[in-house]
Each structure stands twice: as C-alpha cells, then as structure tokens.
Amino acid sequence: MRLCDRDIEAWLDEGRLSITPRPPVERINGATVDVRLGNKFRTFRGHTAAFIDLSGPKDEVSAALDRVMSDEIVLPDGEAFYLHPGELALAVTFESVTLPPDLVGWLDGRSSLARLGLMVHVTAHRIDPGWSGCIVLEFYNSGKLPLALRPGMLIGALSFEPLSGPAARPYNRRQDAKYRDQQGAVASRIDKD
C-alpha cells in the first residue's frame, strides 16, 4: 500500500524519509511528491559506433561508453536544455532523496509532459530501499518538436510504498551499488555488472 500525503508528511517530519530540499506542502498531493528538474545533463555524442556489445568484454563496453557519452553538462541559471525528437538524454532531479531500508520509491513522469512526447524515465522508475542521492532521469523525446527543458520545472512525481520489513540488502549497503550517492547525471555503468 502506497503512502498517502499525510503519511508522506509524517515520514518526512519523523526523519524516516528525507527529500532535500524539503518540498512545500503544495507539492505533496494525494499519494505523490512533485519533483523538479535539476541542472545537470548528459547526452550521446556524435559518433560512428555501429553498436555497443552490452555483453562483451567489460573493458570494450567501458571504452565504447566513453566514446559515445558526453561529459556532464551543467546549465547556468535561466538556460534551457533542448531535447530534439528521437533523442535520449540523462538528467537529474533537483531534489536529493534518501529512503530507509523498509521503503521503496517510484518515479512517474507528468501526464502533461507525456502528452507532448516526453518520456521522463525510459524504464527505470523504481528507487531501491536504502537509496540516497539525486534521481537520474532518462529523457526521450518521442514527439515531433524539440522540447525546451528548464531546471526547476516540475518534471515528475514520487510515490512511496512500505515493504513488509526492512530489506536485508538495502542499496546503500550493497558492495555492487554502482550509483551510490549520485548527485549528477551519471552515465550507464553496465560495464560494472
């Protein structure tokens, strides 16, 4: 059962759940907390790679990722990031989220943005128990027009679901946690699998 707005506020008040900066009550609605777009992005460079063999040797996968992913782009205040039709880009939420070991989070994109062709997360919308950090967004523009995305705009909504008990292996305690404490638009680390 997902937390309702009253329970989300109580978990925040008690320190069991942390969202920094703490959202105002107007952004906690029904069963979700609205989150905003941060100012860090990452894109695919123009490249001539025919493919990336995701199950190939780790050093080759790592080298291929280095060739195709841009360095992190940090937008100055007031500037927009333009996502063109058919493009994929990574970004982060403005808010940093810390979940306890007995709570899982879910990120959903905004319906108003989806109706313009913007996918906010291509597949990865679960936020593991024990997670701490900004949430990476996997943007894809499936529409017909470029979309101007500005830091600070409402981009999605988080919901939270208590588990039957604390996870035995929460994300922040796993040795194989590839994205622990991420604050920026971290590129894929599939080569670390």
Swiss-Prot record:
List of residues binding dCTP: 110-115, 128, 136-138, 171, 178, 182
Catalytic residues of the enzyme? 138 (proton donor/acceptor)
Q: Which UniProt keywords apply?
A: Hydrolase, Nucleotide metabolism, Nucleotide-binding
**Signal peptide interval:** none
The protein's matches in InterPro entries, at most eight in alphabetical order, are given as: dCTP_deaminase, dUTPase-like_sf, dUTPase_trimeric
The molecular function terms in GO held by this entry are: dCTP deaminase activity; nucleotide binding
Keyword Nucleotide-binding set for record = yes
**Region of interest (Disordered), residue spans:** 169-193
Q: Which reaction does it catalyse?
A: dCTP + H2O + H(+) = dUTP + NH4(+)
| Catalytic activity, EC | 3.5.4.13
Q: Name one GO biological process term.
A: dUMP biosynthetic process
Concerning Pfam families, the annotation shows: DCD
- Which pathway is this protein engaged in? Pyrimidine metabolism; dUMP biosynthesis; dUMP from dCTP (dUTP route): step 1/2
Q: How does it assemble?
A: Homotrimer.
Which family is this sequence assigned to?
Belongs to the dCTP deaminase family.
The record describes the protein's role as: Catalyzes the deamination of dCTP to dUTP.
Q: What protein does this entry describe?
A: dCTP deaminase
Q: Which organism is it from?
A: Salmonella typhimurium (strain LT2 / SGSC1412 / ATCC 700720)
Gene it is expressed from = dcd
